[in-house]
A protein has these predicted regions:
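Helix N-cap/capping motif at the beta->alpha junctions
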Residues: 36-45, 66
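Alpha4 helix (beta4-alpha4-beta5 surface) of REC/receiver domains from two-component response regulators
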Residues: 23, 68, 91-106
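Two-component/phosphorelay signaling modules centered on CheY-like receiver
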Residues: 16-35, 102
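Active-site beta3 strand of CheY-like receiver
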Residues: 50-56
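Receiver (REC) domain active-site loop signature in two-component systems and cognate sites
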Residues: 61
């Protein structure tokens, strides 16, 4: 059982309000280490500079979307093992299937509750302490 406070998280979303909501939700679950990026390109730079244990990324973003970020993270050996949860505003089966093909660990449809986020994170890491 990992301690939530030990999991370094990268939040990638082009909306600052959504990044704040994710951060606040994660803090409620005991997470303490965060970095943020406003698009996939910035998220990839963050991951290359200092890899995170968990990436929570929006799908629909400018410059490099969430699927492009996922593919780039999985292709780069130092970051390939990071857990990746994709956020999407639409429950699109084709999108989910494509993300699974590229190695997404879980996905979450917006809007979401803290309990739903917890379920998705625990689906990747197991029960949190």
């Amino acid at each position: 059982m990992p301690a939530a406070s030990a999991i370094h998280t990268l939040i990638v979303d082009d909306q600052a309000s959504m990044r704040a909501l994710i951060r606040t939700s994660m803090q409620a679950l005991g997470f303490r280490e965060f970095r943020e990026a406003g698009d996939g390109e910035a998220g990839l730079r963050e991951m290359i500079t200092r890899p995170a244990h968990l990436i929570i990324s929006d799908f629909n973003m400018p410059n490099l979307d969430g699927l492009g970020l996922l593919r780039a993270v999985r292709a780069h050996p130092p970051t390939a093992g990071a857990a990746f949860i994709m956020l999407t505003g639409r429950a699109d089966r084709e999108l989910v299937q494509r993300a699974v093909q590229f190695g997404v660990n879980n996905y979450l449809v917006k809007p979401f509750t803290v309990a739903q986020l917890k379920d998705k994170v625990e689906g990747v890491f197991g029960p949190l302490t």
